[in-house]
Amino acid sequence: MRVYLNGEYLEQARAAVSVDDRGFLFGDGVYEVTRARNGRLFEAGRHLRRLERGLEALGIAPPPGFEPGGGALLEIADRLLRDNGLMNGDALVYLEITRGVAERTHHFPPAGTPPTVFLRTNRLAAPDDVRERGATVITTPDLRWERCDLKTVQLLPNVLAKQQAVTAGAFEAVFVRAGIVTEGASTNVFVVIDGAIHTHPATQRILPGITREIVLELAAERGLRVVEQAVPLEELRGASELFLTSTSTEVMPVARLDGGAVGSGRPGPVARQLHAALRERL
């Protein structure tokens, strides 16, 4: 499998990032994961706009020609998909930009330090078996920082929450902060209450997921009522449906929450409808 690293296309085994890279030392960088179907990137513009916002917030200037709207990143992604035989079916493109290689200091390195740019691709195997029966999820305290809206590579709290889910035999861990449901370790969370779809508003408490954004549009197009407001944990437990969204999981209905059934204990009609609509959009 070939990857791109700082101007070079090379075999993954030959790709090496410096031990002084700030992404390695501090988690000082941002990333994006974009879906490709039959070689076509899905909603690449939205992903690149979110990347640009993250770079600006962190004060990382991409190399000349690599501005998110400049096209170079799309050209690299296209070449990797072709080189790796991923022009048919579903694939993922992973992109990471860090603040680059510099002496280890907590403050920013000198102006002009080249950022590290890395892209890779891989085949996507959607978890359709889990979707068919409905996922099992657990809740866990949300102990993350206050800028969850930035897609940074510093994901340790998410890693710990995901491992907690795996240990419990669950698909996902859902964060709860001060009694309010925020999002999943790697997903956004939607809840159906009294026929209306509820999801946490796009504040600094959650990542503004691209699939989340699209699902909100699909719901509105179908006349479904959507409420973007905080959902207390107690309401989550009494919801008729609960589902998750992300680039790789698409729309994932939840059948069990913390050991108890969600609604009927089977994938619900709203989640099924929105997943079918998303598949049509893909």
Q: Which residues make up each language-model segment?
A:
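Feature captures the catalytic cores and cofactor-binding loops of soluble hydro-lyases/lyases
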Residues: 209-214
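Glycine- and Gly-Pro-enriched alpha-helical subdomains that act as flexible
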Residues: 176, 180-202, 208
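Conserved alpha/beta cores of soluble small-molecule-handling proteins
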Residues: 1-173, 178, 203, 217-282
